[in-house]
A protein has these predicted regions:
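A residue-level marker of the well-folded mature domains of exported/periplasmic proteins
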Residues: 2-12, 19-21, 26-320
Length: 320
């Protein structure tokens, strides 16, 4: 913790009271069990409400409690303006460090500048900017590689045949753009992307997209879906249209997703543990604040391509 944290906390009491009111609709406080005046105080700004984000929040909360840190949290609900407002509110609460799961990589520049001007370190999860000089650290997921792993499975399964591929992306920005970019970039020349539409990380929207996709492309061979929640809806739409043979590859590695791989509903998923990201973010933020030389600024979260053959190797996705 920075030496000035106690004095900054005292100076911002009135602002913190205002921030508590501002955050009451979208944030929460978790006193993790330590002495509030003597422990690290962290602010976690989450990006959305998908299953991934819910598991990430749970992991951050549980790890903060274990580390005896006080935690404030807020949700930006896929809106970059709300994200910056949440960061401003956390600054007013005078946290010792911010942990941010951004809604959009382009929003990070403003986030980092705002935190820097307030003298508060910022730690990023999942994605990062190319310039990390003003960042405390990052728990980084190579989302391009996640997409590429799914594309590699298709290349192997297609075995040189000409195939048609559909993409159900998430919401434009951050995770979805990186996933889809990595997937498209790694597809073999024999795989043609014939449809690419955003499902907005919303199962109902994804199902509608899939219904239109299979109607327009009845001979579709494969579909890449940007998360498992949407993938279940896409599977439902394809099956209802008699397209049970379309093979779906996706990303997450939830218990439900692994069961779908086992049953054959999904052909493959890339396990990207929200629990590991949250644990790493909290522990490394505290370690870096304490100038622990054993803690790396950049922590790479491992990815695992999961098929029927290696379901048991998938990491735990969400805290129980």
């Amino acid at each position: 913790m920075k030496p000035t944290a106690r004095s900054r906390r005292a100076a911002a009491v009135s602002l913190a009271g205002v921030a508590a009111l501002v955050l009451s609709g979208c944030g929460s406080e978790s006193d993790a069990g330590g002495d509030v005046d003597g422990s690290v105080t962290l602010g976690f700004v989450n990006g959305a409400n998908t299953h991934f984000h819910q598991c990430l929040l749970k992991s951050v909360e549980e790890t903060a409690k274990t580390e005896k840190a006080t935690l404030y949290s807020a949700n930006s609900k896929q809106d970059a303006g709300t994200e910056l407002s949440n960061i401003e509110d956390m600054i007013a609460r005078n946290v010792d460090a911010l942990i941010v799961q951004t809604v959009n990589v382009d929003a990070l520049e403003g986030d980092i500048a705002k935190a820097k001007s307030a003298g508060i370190p910022i730690y990023l999860t999942s994605v990062a900017t190319s310039d990390l000089s003003d960042v405390l650290g990052v728990a980084k997921v190579d989302l391009k590689q996640a997409g590429a792993l799914d594309a590699g499975w298709i290349e192997k399964d297609a075995a040189g045949k000409d195939v048609k591929v559909g993409i159900v992306a998430g919401a434009p920005g951050a995770a979805s753009d990186l996933l889809v970019g990595g997937f498209k970039g790694a597809l073999p020349a024999t795989a043609k992307v014939v449809a690419n539409q955003p499902g907005m990380f919303n199962p109902a929207k994804a199902q509608d997209v899939a219904e239109n996709m299979i109607q327009a492309q009845p001979d579709l061979d494969y579909a890449f879906v940007a998360n498992e929640e949407m993938a279940f809806a896409v599977r439902k739409a394809f099956d209802a249209a008699g397209a049970e043979d379309v093979k779906i590859v996706t990303v997450n590695g939830t218990d439900e997703g692994l069961a779908a791989v086992t049953s054959g509903e999904f052909s493959a998923t890339v396990a990207n543990s929200a629990m590991s990201i949250g644990q790493t973010a909290v522990k490394n933020t505290i370690g870096l604040l304490n100038k622990d030389k054993t803690v790396d600024k950049i922590a790479n979260i491992p990815l695992v391509l999961v098929t029927k053959d290696n379901v048991s190797e998938a990491p735990q996705y969400c805290p129980k």
